[in-house]
Amino acid sequence: MSEPLKPRIDFAEPLKEEPTSAFKAQQTFSEAESRTFAPAAIDERPEDEGVAEAAVDAALRPKRSLWRKMVMGGLALFGASVVGQGVQWTMNAWQTQDWVALGGCAAGALIIGAGVGSVVTEWRRLWRLRQRAHERDEARELLHSHSVGKGRAFCEKLAQQAGIDQSHPALQRWYAAIHETQNDREIVGLYAHLVQPVLDAQARREISRFAAESTLMIAVSPLALVDMAFIAWRNLRLINRIATLYGIELGYYSRLRLFRLVLLNIAFAGASELVREVGMDWMSQDLAARLSTRAAQGIGAGLLTARLGIKAMELCRPLPWIDNDKPRLGDFRRQLIGQLKETLQKSKSSPEK
């Protein structure tokens, strides 16, 4: 009975919010604490990389302008007119028994058919390259999904596109590891850890081989024009090899588009990553003082080829990078330097013998 009475609560009125101070309380540090104080390092690289990726997507997104629609409509109308006129000429030649004109119409029909077939084939290959980006987005969604039923069919489709046989040991291990109680995220994750590294290892070997050839060619060759032509040819072959490994058949326009994608990715995100991964280690080892100018140029060309191959891998892979499995330039740099030093030592020792 000695407890004080509680104040009345009127439920008809809105609840009163407790006033909150707009200012934080002052914090004071002693002199000893100020000596050991270390500011928190804020990593702004993910935000910068996100801005770069958004810029790449904006640059690569096709722009449907009115002029393009008018040109496409005009070409379609012209093609229909050519086909109609060809049919009319064929009918007239058949009725008048003009066999020479009829043979010309048949030859023209064969040429037009071959051209249409080439256009359809190029469009199909270009569509397949664009579809790989959609598959990568789908894989990213499955890796963050808890649904069931889509992961296995998706991974089997990827294995079929890459040309992996059903009896392959990696694919057999994946089949043995999955079961019905697993969701899509776990199934796709197992595929990324058991099957996808087989293709990635082959792509890494191709990148290492092409980068080493570029490094040695630049370091040995005295002709700059030959170097430029050789590097351009080898880089195009590297892109073709990586695309073939990941099950993408390139045509003329799809090859140009993939090369454009790679160059744009390097332009937006390559410089900062190159400096971050190579610059400090390069200066610490003082390689510029140890190697000649041509050797340094060869290492630079090899690193550029490796960078090109890494970006081609990223654009041709059906799965996004997970668990830091993306290859780094440092992985290829040590190999390039070792091969170049070995070659230079052999070239110096051979005249002495």
UniProtKB/Swiss-Prot annotation:
Tell me the superkingdom of the source.
Bacteria
Q: Where is the composition biased (Basic and acidic residues)?
A: 1-19
Q: Where are the transmembrane segments?
A: 70-90, 100-120, 213-233
Q: Which Pfam families match?
A: DUF697
Its membrane topology = Multi-pass membrane protein
Q: Name one GO cellular component term.
A: plasma membrane
Sorted alphabetically, the keyword list is: Cell inner membrane, Cell membrane, Membrane, Transmembrane, Transmembrane helix
Give the subcellular location.
Cell inner membrane
- Locate the region Disordered: 1-35
Major site of localization recorded for this protein: membrane
* Family designation: Belongs to the UPF0283 family.
Which named protein is this? UPF0283 membrane protein YcjF
The lineage is:
Bacteria, Pseudomonadati, Pseudomonadota, Gammaproteobacteria, Enterobacterales
- What gene is behind this protein? ycjF
